[in-house]
Amino acid sequence: MVFFYLQIMNNLIPEKIICITEETTETIYLLGEEKRLIGISGFTKRPKIAKKQKEVVSTFLDADIEKIIELEPDLVIGFSDIQSSIAEKLIKKGVTVLINNYRSISGIFKMIYNVGCLVGKNEASKDLINEIKNKHKQIANNSSKWKKKPKVYFEEWDNPQISGIKWVSEIIHLCGGNDIFIEHSKESLAKDRIISSNDVIKKNPDIIIASWCGKKVKKEKIKKRNGWEKIKAVKNNEIHEIKSEIILQPGPASITDGVELIHEIFSNWYKRNIVS
């Protein structure tokens, strides 16, 4: 009976999956089930080999609907209400679509587990989640011993200036920092996280981390903003860039490499400013 049940379950696992967003592609590769992937987003950078192996069928805001239909996927996976128009077009064509819609670290863990279940890797996804959580505990334990926590401004875009989304704010906290715009982080849409230069000057962050959604961060441009020469982070040359495919990807990248990079920035700041 167990064998029969597993056979039924295996028959339900989608054999042909298209990911129109990067984080699920990386998750499927991490789980060793990339053979199921037949199409991916053109923005995919993790793993690097993915774009050499898989058909590119979308950007983030647009998709080649006809190409997707021609590939005859069992399932298309996307992210958030921002991709709702793509999902609607595909659904009208009879394509099965799964849209993940979360903005938190816990949401990322749920996505990893759900994708694991979809591809028949329940236990492997649990192992991956536990491995990441254990690393988080080590980092949180280390930073909890600090006598002072840095005030941090995360800039998601430069014009207009946009502060960090929820999972970024949570990573800042996890790594031992205080997000100076934590009250905005709960807003899922970037337009609701627009802040002014004066807001940043008043809050006077110790550290600035910028990630401009795929655009190269220009540190000198940040330094030359009117009045920003007064900010501690500018005076002490604590302006850092993290690539958007790492920290702004709501998936494994942000909660692994993103966490490690931010913790390293904070640790170095602490050693320079607090440890005698």
Locations of regions flagged by a protein language model:
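N-terminal ligand-binding lobe of clamshell/alpha-beta domains
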Residues: 3, 8-276
